[in-house]
Amino acid sequence: MTLQGSLTHEEYCAALLAETDRLREIVRTADLSATVPTCPDWTLAELARHVGGAHRWTGTIVATRASESVDPADVPGGAGPEDKGAAALDAWLAEGVEQTVAALREAGPDTEVWSWTTARNTGFWARRMVHETVIHRADAALAAGVPFDVPAPVAADCLEEWLQIGELPMVVARFAERGGELLGPGRTIHVHATDAPPGLDAEWLLDLTGAAPAHRRTHEKAAVALRGPLTDVLQVLYRRLPADSDRVEVLGERALLDQWLEWATFG
């Protein structure tokens, strides 16, 4: 099991800047005291501080070539600006992501650093921060009541990363603690993005018939299929959109999809 992405290191760096810019636009224009429906313990301001703190934490890991986890309390500026206003929060987000991207670009994708996975390199962090920002931008868009969409290559890679992380042994073990008989004969899930542009392979089969979850990119019949626009399918898997939304279609054993989503929730 690898955590190989489909974009180049520079494409991840550019996407991280672009996704943060889109988040910042929401921060500048929305009610920062609004509760985030998909993260109900947070206001929009707290969500933005979480994302900006994650950027700076990652930037510190990369810039210092950390060989072990970094205490968030040791990250310069990691707690966010003292000023609670939108302008200060926007400027803090911009400064943090620029510092992090500069560190990622300087390091390149293959520099060894600590991570919580088997992929102990800077390339892992470039990809992870893009998709951390994508999903929390979805949260912010929900809180602000504004549309949410993701460029197709980024959305497909975000979905692929979700499946890859869900197959890591330490993650599978954590999921298994939630109980339930998820694995077994005939338990397969087909995910199909119906609006993928030509050349983008945006169909996956999640195979739950073996000793651990596995996936492959293929068009293949399954016990249940989730179909819809790529951004919407991604949100369903990350539980930012309910599977019974009229924006997606579920065909077959709906209970299996629901069980998987409950079992494999993270992020």
Task: Specify the residue positions occupied by each region the protein language model found.
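Active-site-proximal cofactor/substrate-binding loop regions of enzyme domains
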Residues: 11-81, 85-91, 95-96, 100
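Acidic/His-leaning functional-site neighborhoods
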Residues: 194-230
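Glycine/alanine-rich phosphate-binding loops at beta-alpha junctions
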Residues: 1-6
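C-terminal interaction segments
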Residues: 219-267
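Short, contiguous alpha-helical
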Residues: 31-72, 117-176, 233
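Short, mixed-charge aromatic SLiMs
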Residues: 72-84, 154-168, 253-265
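A glycine-rich beta-turn/hairpin centered on an aromatic-Pro dipeptide
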Residues: 162-206
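Acidic/histidine-rich alpha-helical segments that form the ligand environment
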Residues: 81-111, 122-132, 139, 182-190, ...
